[in-house]
Amino acid sequence: YITLIQWWNKNATREGTHLYIGQDVARTMKADQLTRKMLYERSLSKVKGNCFWPANEILWNNKGVADSLKRNYHRYPALIPAYTHLHNRAPQEVKKLKTEWTAQGYMLHWQAEQSKTNPELASYFVIYRFENKEPVNLDDPSKIVAVTRETNYLLPYDDGKHKYRYVVTAV
């Protein structure tokens, strides 16, 4: 395992290459391996993440892997790293961001051109929530409340006593 990952890390030399390590949860994941694997992979410069399969093993929480991932490694949503070697411009910004009271609660709406294939246009949107006077920091994944392809989002409504600021980015 270590020899193979070191080889891939060394040989993934093309500029902008993203290296994701495949993990067969059912056949190769022993209970004590996850921590060692995750820490080692995160120490390598080219490794950008993991791909766990089969997906149902994660859904079934085989060997407690899903719990461990949520608790220790993936507490917050993650965005796919930008493929800047393919396209280095961000999609057009969202426009006309507004809230509206509906029968379901407060709904956040915005406008944006979308495309699954044109990188100039949004594929999906990331919604961040900040305390009213908190500085906006889009590098803080704990502030992500949703990732969606829709151009609206039902806001989580706590008790009406806290004011929040929402930011929507096009990705």
Locations of the language-model features?
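Flexible loop/turn segments at secondary-structure boundaries
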Residues: 28-30, 58-61, 105, 117, ...
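Substrate-binding cleft of secreted/luminal carbohydrate-active enzymes
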Residues: 1, 5-86
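Beta-strand-rich modules
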Residues: 155-171
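Pro/Thr/Ser/Gly-rich low-complexity, intrinsically disordered linker/stalk tracts
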Residues: 65-120, 160, 171
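Short S/T/G- and acidic-enriched coil/turn segments that sit immediately N-terminal to beta-strands
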Residues: 148-154
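Catalytic domains of carbohydrate-active enzymes that cleave complex glycans
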Residues: 47-52, 111, 115-120, 148
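Local beta-strand/beta-hairpin segments that build beta-sheet-rich folds
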Residues: 138-146
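Solvent-exposed loop/turn segments flanking beta-strands in beta-repeat/beta-sandwich domains
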Residues: 113-139, 163
